[in-house]
């Protein structure tokens, strides 16, 4: 029954909303419409912010934290990157290429470039409507909190809960349970390929280690400060090295990406919609722009200007998809197609790494993914804190119950089929995006006022 419900909602969100009468028909989903419309609107409204203010984004990340009660700008970027790098950049890209082919990579890029401005808006609002966190200290917030503020403004009175805010919080908790499943499924598959360890064994060990970390009463994300940058740099350096060695083949790979993104063959066969949807879907899973995930971390930053936190998260979207995701995609697309035909998931990525680096490549991906999985799991549980508190109030029992549920999903995910574990996460992130957009459009004017004020002050300096 639950499986059928998840499949039904999945089809509503990611199935064809309408079909354009071109070739074999181009199916366009509700989520494609929402994300592209919002991305184009906010990019135009912010006057191409990712291009105009790129230097300001870099400066915001490097700014030192003078307030010890919250996360620094760098720590906030690290937390959001922890959930993107690994599950998004490795697993998400693999899923996009597996299901949508090389053309899906192009639409991941488009989703990121448009999504950077959306991420700026939502993260700026998260800073503005954040609240003190009596349980963990510092601050908490996110879409549930600015949705609540919007509902109070429209009703003209104080509310204990808002329906849309509560629905966002529930959707987020569902999504992060789904991500927990993807984590264990990917790691167990990678270890089976690299070391021939049964999935059950890997999943049990992974769940036990995760429990030791997250079931502490006040587990922090300080460990991510070192773990995530080191992992990301190691992975980036290795992949760039492979690309340099194969630089003569890169034009052909780029040509294939663009050809399949707009290819007449895909349109004629009715496959363009699949390429587009998988690029957008996995792009959203990777960079989270518009879904409302990253604002949960952005709200916790001790920042003297909400606009600066908007810059930090917008930069995170670009780093994630345009840089790191591209490296992963090129690694796979440099491999002769006859060697990867019929492969999906970690089988595809590890085969690609084995082609480039021999047996070391398979082991490297397995080890890297295992480390990434911990950072991702810590990151999503950090996101969950404020949403659990919004639904259940300030108490430790509700926080612990959600952690236990996430651990159970981690255990279950390692034993399920590859395609099944994605559905719950896709449903959750799709619902999150819908409820988040309900607030972003009416409240975006406040983020724009803050941006205009920032630019005026900048001119006076």
Predicted regions and their residues:
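N-terminal alpha-helical transmembrane segments of multi-pass membrane transport
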Residues: 1-87, 97-104, 115, 439-461
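Membrane-interface loop-to-helix entry segments
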Residues: 34-35, 42-58, 164, 185-191, ...
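Helix-loop-helix module between adjacent transmembrane segments
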Residues: 38-43, 81, 114-139, 148-185, ...
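Transmembrane helix-loop junctions in multi-pass membrane proteins
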Residues: 45-50, 89-93, 175-188, 211-223, ...
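Flexible loop linkers connecting adjacent transmembrane helices
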Residues: 48-73, 95, 101-102, 117-159, ...
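Alpha-helical membrane segments and immediately flanking helix-loop junctions
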Residues: 67-99, 125-128, 135-150, 163, ...
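Selective recognition of specific alpha-helical transmembrane segments in multi-pass small-molecule
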Residues: 114-122, 202-217, 228-248, 281-284, ...
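Extracellular/periplasmic helix-exit of transmembrane alpha-helices
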Residues: 122-134, 240-256, 270, 300-303, ...
């Amino acid at each position: 029954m639950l499986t059928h419900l998840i499949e039904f909602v999945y089809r509503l969100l990611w199935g064809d909303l309408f079909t354009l009468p071109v070739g074999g028909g181009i199916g366009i989903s509700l989520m494609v419409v929402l994300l592209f419309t919002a991305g184009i609107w906010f990019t135009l409204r912010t006057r191409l912010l990712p291009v105009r203010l790129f230097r300001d984004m870099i400066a915001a990340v490097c700014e030192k934290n003078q307030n010890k009660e919250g996360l620094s700008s760098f720590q906030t970027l690290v937390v959001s990157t922890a959930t993107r790098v690994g599950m998004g950049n490795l697993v998400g890209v693999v899923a996009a290429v597996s299901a949508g082919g090389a053309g899906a990579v192009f639409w991941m890029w488009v989703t990121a470039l448009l999504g950077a401005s959306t991420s700026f808006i939502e993260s700026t609002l998260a800073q503005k409507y954040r609240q003190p966190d009596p349980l963990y200290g510092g601050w908490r917030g996110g879409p549930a909190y600015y949705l609540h503020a919007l509902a109070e403004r429209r009703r003209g009175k104080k509310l204990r809960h808002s329906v849309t805010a509560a629905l966002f919080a529930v959707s987020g908790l569902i999504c992060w349970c789904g991500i927990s499943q993807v984590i264990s499924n990917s790691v167990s598959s990678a270890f089976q390929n690299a070391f021939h360890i049964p999935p059950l064994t890997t999943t049990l060990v992974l769940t036990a280690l995760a429990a030791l970390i997250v079931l502490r009463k006040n587990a922090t994300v300080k460990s991510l400060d070192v773990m995530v940058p080191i992992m990301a740099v190691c992975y980036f350096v290795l992949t760039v090295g492979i690309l340099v060695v194969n630089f003569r083949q890169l034009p052909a790979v780029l040509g294939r990406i663009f050809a399949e993104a707009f290819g007449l063959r895909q349109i004629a066969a009715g496959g363009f919609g699949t390429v587009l949807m998988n690029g957008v879907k996995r792009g959203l899973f990777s960079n989270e722009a518009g879904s409302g995930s990253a604002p949960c971390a952005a709200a916790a930053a001790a920042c003297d200007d909400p606009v600066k936190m908007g810059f930090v998260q917008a930069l995170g979207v670009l780093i994630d998809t345009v840089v790191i995701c591209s490296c992963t995609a090129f690694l796979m697309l440099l491999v002769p197609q006859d060697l990867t035909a019929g492969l999906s998931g970690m089988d595809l990525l590890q085969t690609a790494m084995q082609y480039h680096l021999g047996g070391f490549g398979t082991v490297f991906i397995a080890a890297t993914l295992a480390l990434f999985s911990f950072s991702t799991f810590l990151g999503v549980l950090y996101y969950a804190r404020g949403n659990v508190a919004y639904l259940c109030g300030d108490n430790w029992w509700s926080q612990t119950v959600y952690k236990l549920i996430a651990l159970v999903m981690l255990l279950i995910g390692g034993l399920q089929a590859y395609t099944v574990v994605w559905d719950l996460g896709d449903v959750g992130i799709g619902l999150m995006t819908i409820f988040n957009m309900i607030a972003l459009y009416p409240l975006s004017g406040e983020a724009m006022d803050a941006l205009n004020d920032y630019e005026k002050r900048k001119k006076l300096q």
